[in-house]
Swiss-Prot record:
Its EC number(s): 3.1.1.96
Biological function: An aminoacyl-tRNA editing enzyme that deacylates mischarged D-aminoacyl-tRNAs. Also deacylates mischarged glycyl-tRNA(Ala), protecting cells against glycine mischarging by AlaRS. Acts via tRNA-based rather than protein-based catalysis; rejects L-amino acids rather than detecting D-amino acids in the active site. By recycling D-aminoacyl-tRNA to D-amino acids and free tRNA molecules, this enzyme counteracts the toxicity associated with the formation of D-aminoacyl-tRNA entities in vivo and helps enforce protein L-homochirality.
Protein name: D-aminoacyl-tRNA deacylase
Primary subcellular site in the record, as a coarse category: cytoplasm
Length: 144
């Protein structure tokens, strides 16, 4: 399971011109589900996302996690994170989980996150437009 996290001042996701998820300060989490992923991996990734210290403290050091910084999560599914780009000029998505399995784990990740922190989401398998203002920029690839 892959989480590409970006520290943001704000982020929102739209589907067909309608905002379906929006946060102010926090983390945009682009979530990629791979074959073999399960709820245990989702739990482990969520704990890492929630505890990863990417927000600055009073001395300007990255010592605070999203909860300590008073932030939120915007979780957006992104199957392209599971792409294999090693061969040729077209990505292969053979490592990605089947859509039904990926959706179930995406929803599970969202539900578990929402129990711990204010969380918004995109819409699984939709054509989404994601807007954000990076803060830093600060971006990390987390893989479980």
């Amino acid at each position: 399971m892959i989480g590409l996290i970006q520290r943001v001042k704000w982020a929102k996701v739209e589907v067909e011109g309608q905002t379906v998820g929006e946060i102010t300060q926090g983390l945009l989490v682009l979530l990629g589900v791979e074959q073999g992923d399960d709820q245990a991996k989702a739990d482990k990734l969520l704990e890492k996302v929630l505890n990863y210290r990417v927000f600055s403290d009073e001395q300007g050091k990255m010592n605070l996690n999203v909860q300590q910084a008073g932030g939120s999560l915007l979780v957006v599914s992104q199957f392209t994170l599971a792409a294999d780009t090693n061969k040729g000029l077209r990505p292969s998505f053979s490592r990605g989980a089947a859509p039904q399995e990926a959706n179930a784990l995406y929803e599970y990740f969202h539900q578990q996150a929402a129990r711990k922190i204010h969380t918004q989401t995109g819409q699984f398998a939709a054509d989404m437009q994601v807007s954000l203002q990076n803060d830093g920029p600060v971006t990390f690839w987390l893989q479980i």
